[in-house]
């Protein structure tokens, strides 16, 4: 018996081929054959898709499981949605870029970027790129690709990268982290007002004039000299002082008239007193320079006298023969510009030559001189020490020249130099 083909209706379902209402009951619930690639029987008797991670079904639709930072945009495209965090000076800008936020002052601005820079930062423009650079001045430089401090000797770096000064002999670092000089206290070096100084002792001093051109107070160390000592042209110590001699009182060699014999300032007296321990070595001469009875000598004149009187301090009294402005301590060929106030050491000793008006043997020094140095014209010179009882003077000396009356008529009075000595007061 042949079987005829069965016709299929339009609503025939090959998975569930039998209509539960019209056909006979299905003899078996076993599903037709299917591939396990992408399919599964879940629940039992139901054929369904088997999605793997990250797919899953949601509201009857297959969709993707989205984790943190991933999302779908309005068109259904998968996008990243990362939540970024920034702390000042970082901030977010367009297209999720984060620039540095700088102090809002006017500075060069990088084109197309919201950067503002304060010096030393700036933009180095080129045809290819605009490069952020840092400007630096003296003392800084590049070492490889790093900014570094440039050091010159004696500066260097220690093992920890700190700047230090290389110290040599004569310098050290104190406990207070200060650089200090090493000095030899035992060799005459000391600190004075924060500076190194020479510790000079007795007999030494600093000079009064600078020895270095253009340097103030560059004074040399000198031997400290007492009264009566000086340096000669070779720098050796010598007795006396050729520039400022406090061992010599004199009238100077100036030819100007300085004393009175018969009239005011009619003669030039040259008198030099030099202290030699307890003795005074003296030289005297006199010359009339103005017209009068001594220039020329008249027949009525046979003597000439010069008087010098001093107070208790040995200061010359001006109301007597010699002008005070031509009398003082020797300084070169002149006298010290500052009037002296004490010269008792040059005065005739008041014990050896007591003050008296009468002529005594011990008060007088007698010698012979010559008229204008002519040995054929002798004169008698009498030097009297402290030979006055004048209450205004404590010490005195006078020079009395005498000759035979009528001997030198017509000549100008002048007496050659005469040297003598006497005992000093001190």
UniProtKB/Swiss-Prot annotation:
It is found in: Virion; Host nucleus. Induction: Expressed in the late phase of the viral replicative cycle. Gene3D superfamilies: Adenovirus pIV-related, attachment domain, reovirus attachment protein sigma1, domain 1. One of its GO terms (biological process) is cell adhesion. SUPFAM superfamilies: Fibre shaft of virus attachment proteins (SSF51225), Virus attachment protein globular domain (SSF49835). Pfam families: Adeno_knob, Adeno_shaft. All late proteins expressed from the major late promoter are produced by alternative splicing and alternative polyadenylation of the same gene giving rise to non-overlapping ORFs. A leader sequence is present in the N-terminus of all these mRNAs and is recognized by the viral shutoff protein to provide expression although conventional translation via ribosome scanning from the cap has been shut off in the host cell. The keyword Transport does not apply. This is Fiber protein. Keywords: Capsid protein, Host nucleus, Host-virus interaction, Late protein, Viral attachment to host adhesion receptor, Viral attachment to host cell, Virion, Virus entry into host cell. It comes from the Viruses. One of its GO terms (cellular component) is host cell nucleus. Belongs to the adenoviridae fiber family. Forms spikes that protrude from each vertex of the icosahedral capsid. Interacts with host receptor CXCAR to provide virion initial attachment to target cell. Fiber proteins are shed during virus entry, when virus is still at the cell surface. The tail region anchors the fiber to penton base capsomers, whereas the shaft, built from several repeated motifs, allows the knob to protrude from the virion. Homotrimer. Interacts with host receptor CXCAR. Interacts (via N-terminal tail region) with pentons.
